[in-house]
Amino acid sequence: SDKIAKNQALELGMRINAVPAGVFQNKTQFIRLLKEYKNKGVEYVVCGDVLEGDQSLLEITYCLTAGLRPVMPLWKRTNTEILQLVEKHRIEAIITYIEDEKQIDEKWLGKKYDRVFFEELKRIQVDEIGEDGEFHSTVVDACIFNKRLDFTFGKVEYTNQGVKIPLIV
């Protein structure tokens, strides 16, 4: 949610500039937006992509076209390497969405993404970092946060796309 993102930015000591989701689908509009940031002194865009795909290639192309350097710290890292980074940097992420509760048990909603969850996903042969959208998580704390996000859990919601538990800040 916007409130979560704003609170994450606050705890990082950074500003956040929300961009409507549809902007990414409009190449011209997105590149124009990136150029505006370039003109304000931005040099880099950090992307969280792990695997090469259409979206990651678009991100790279758009950044380079706008004169910005894409930084992809997770690019082509193994799932185990990513788990090790989560542990090393004390990242606390809460599982907030499960695409198919027949595949990943709903009991994991609201739990931390940790080695126990990682090993369970490996055991049931689901991508351990959810790269195909099997689950989503929300970061609520990390070693670079000023303090942990203060949140409560909302009511579990069942949709055609999966099951989710909102975090309320």
Name these PLM-found stretches.
Residues 151-169:
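C-terminal accessory domains and tails appended to enzymatic cores
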